[in-house]
Amino acid sequence: MLLVIDIGNTHTVLGLFSGDTLVDHWRVATDARRTADELGFLIRGLLGQARRADGITGVSCCSTVPAALREVRTMSARWFPDAPLVVVEPGIRTGVPVLYDNPREVGADRIVNTLAAFTLHGGPAIVVDFGTSTNFDVVSARGEFLGGVLAPGIDISIDALASRAAQLVKVQVAKPRSVIGKNTVEALQAGIVYGFAAQVDGIVTRIAEQLPSRPVVIATGGLAPVVLDECRTVDVHDPWLTLTGLRLIFERNVPE
């Protein structure tokens, strides 16, 4: 089985593939201070609880946290010594031409999402990844990464508002009764849900105007369900898009 690890700034998502099928998945907090042994114990524990502790034949990983990535390398070598490790970084085969001023600036997760989106849905496409930041990644009709938009994420925006406005507090993210809030909590919820939905629709519309044909719009990321029902431009919700991309990149780099 293939273990895939997507390390984000806030959360780490792990998945287990048997062939093309995602058979299990977990979401844990990202902690850059977590050592290789702590990470190994954590993963072994998750696999053991799912009765899948043995049979890992490969590991594929992408990360936006360099310190955590170093520990993954050590963990994989110690805890899964017979399983080849593929880390998405410059020099790895992805099959994705990166049409960016400096390709090394592009986050590994964005390349992974581009590959998965094009493989599953074709192009042109726009991937909207709701994470610590909200990323809009643009895929050409030939599977090229064209660039995109990086915007503050939902949680970051909520935290900033609560910390900078003395009379506002952090609220539970939920759809309010109406876009016209009748109290402070509902007004904040309306701003979050409808504000971010409008951001998605507005940016997607502007990007689509720059493309030669209508793109398929794919939403992914842990915070997507917060606003997805209010987005008018999203065609597909795929919460495991990044995990699928990690599987595809592993297959491109490790022969069967």
Swiss-Prot record:
Keywords: ATP-binding, Coenzyme A biosynthesis, Cytoplasm, Kinase, Metal-binding, Nucleotide-binding, Potassium, Transferase. K(+) binds at residue 129. Its cofactor is NH4(+); K(+). Catalyzes the phosphorylation of pantothenate (Pan), the first step in CoA biosynthesis. Pathway: Cofactor biosynthesis; coenzyme A biosynthesis; CoA from (R)-pantothenate: step 1/5. ATP binds at residues 6-13, 132. InterPro entries: ATPase_NBD, Type_III_PanK. Its EC number is 2.7.1.33. It is found in: Cytoplasm. It holds the Pfam family Pan_kinase. One of its GO terms (biological process) is coenzyme A biosynthetic process. Substrate binds at residues 100, 107-110, 184. The gene is coaX. The active site is at 109 (proton acceptor). GO terms for molecular function: ATP binding; metal ion binding; pantothenate kinase activity. GO terms for cellular component: cytoplasm. This is Type III pantothenate kinase. It catalyses: (R)-pantothenate + ATP = (R)-4'-phosphopantothenate + ADP + H(+). It is an enzyme of class 2 (transferase). It comes from Acidothermus cellulolyticus (strain ATCC 43068 / DSM 8971 / 11B). Coiled coil: none annotated.
